[in-house]
Structure formats: structure tokens, C-alpha cells
Amino acid sequence: MKTKIRFASLALSLMFASGAALADMKIGVSMSQFDDTWLTYLRESMDTKAKSYPDGVQLQFEDARSDVVRQLSQVESFVSQKVDAIVVNPVDTAATKKITEAAVKAGIPLVYVNRRPDDLNLPKGVVTVASNDLEAGQMQMQYLAEKMGGKGDIVILLGDLANNSTTNRTKGVKEVLTKYPNIKIEQEQSGIWSRDKGMTLVNDWLTQGRKFDAVVSNNDEMAIGAAMALQQAGVAKGSVLIAGVDGTPDGLNAVKKGSLLVSVFQDAKGQADGSIDTAVKMAKNEPVESAVWVPYRLITLQNVDTFK
């Protein structure tokens, strides 16, 4: 009889170990910045995913405000709170070493989301959930190059230079350009992901008398800013082709209206679901992939209505 009781107690304790772990699970999330359109969709989707679990999973969101030191401090705070897992959207993809070390030393699972650290040799217990930014640049530029007939001048609106999404999207663009020697880069400058900055840069280029046939933007926000600058300058819609990345609601609307020729859909829900699901599995000691890739998809006038 005592043996049966012991087995029953063991089974009950195991049940509580797994069930209560989910009900009481707390995940610390450090976002590079709250004041970013696409990252807002990512954060909201994370929250929705966490609430979708039967018992719910508690997320503690922190805003790093584009400050590397602040982000590290947030991660160290998560460690001291003994959270069950940590999710980080890094401010600077070249400055993640101390974040990784802090989580690994504490034995807390770490998931990097949306932005993959520059150091690809991540230790056990550290996973990335992202999309291949090289493909995004390749997809937007290939579509543009074909629409341009393989010739003309382009300007490139770069994102934050501390972010390897900027580097890789632009690298993808330039890889495609090697097949089109008659397409030249007239200008490339950083608009730091901002609609206002994208608008200012394009307005400045127009004021300087620079001529270009297309604008290749690392994201939709800067692309929309470019479209606004061209419109204000009296340039006919569609005479300068514009490509973005993200597929935000504003970006989708711009494609539908013809302000943008093309965008590339970055799946905020897919990355959010993947990051939280992976963090939960790691906290429960379940096996996960070392890298989870969420595919990009091309957005054109012909298929824009299929995206939400």
C-alpha cells in the first residue's frame, strides 16, 4: 500500500512539475525599442501567443530604448529575478556576447528574436528565431530589376547600421545587382528605419538634383517616407519605383494604392509565435532547433489582398 502511495505521490509531483511550470512560467522580454512600427506588431503578437496557452504564460516586457547598456542591465535583472526564460530583440547584433554569457552562466534559456547575433556560434541553451534578411534584399531587388528592364539608377535607404538586418538586406540587394551591370547605385544612406528620415533623405536628393529610377528601402517605413517625398515634389506616382520590406499594414496599403511597387512580408506573428513557443519548450527542457527560420514572402499588387 505504501508503495502505491509513493508512486501516486511521484506521479502527482511530476504532474505539478510540468503543469505548474507552465501556469507559473515567467519570461523576460527585452525589446530593442518600443517606438518602432514593425517591432510593435512583434511585441503585440508575443503577448497574444503567451495568452493563448491554457494556463497562460507571463511576459515581462522591457524597452531598451536603443541602448546596449540598458539592454544588458535588463537581462541581468531578469537573471536576478530567476525568470524561466529570456527573449531578446537585440539593440546591436554585434554586442550580444555579454547578454549570452549572463543567461548561459545562470542556466536560463535565451532566445534571440528577429535579429540574429553576428556571432553565429551560439552555445547550448541559446536559440535564434528570425527570417533570412539576405533573401528579403534579393527578393525585392530581383523584382525591381525585372520591372526596370535591367537598367537605370537606384538609391538605397539603409536601416540602422548597428543592425545586421540592414547589412544582410543590403547585401542581398547588391548580390542581385551583380547580374545587372546596367543598374547603378546613385546614393545609399541610413534612414534608421524611420519614415520621417526616409522622407528627408529622398527630399534632399531631389533638391540636390539627383536622378534615380527606383528606391530600394530596407523597410516599409522608410519606403513610405520616400513615396511621400516624391509626391510632395510633384513626381508622378509609379514613375519612380519603390520597394520596401516588412509588409506592415501601412506597407500593404501603400502597395495596394500603388505608392510602393513591392514589399517583402516579414511575418511578425510567425517570429513571435516561434520565439515564445521555443522559450517555453526550453524552459520545460524539451528539445528545440538551434535556429528557427520564418520565411519571407513577396508582396505585389497581384497578391497584396492575401496578406493581413
Regions found by a protein language model. Give the residues of each.
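Gram-negative bacterial Sec-dependent N-terminal signal peptides
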Residues: 1-23
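A residue-level marker of the well-folded mature domains of exported/periplasmic proteins
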Residues: 21-308
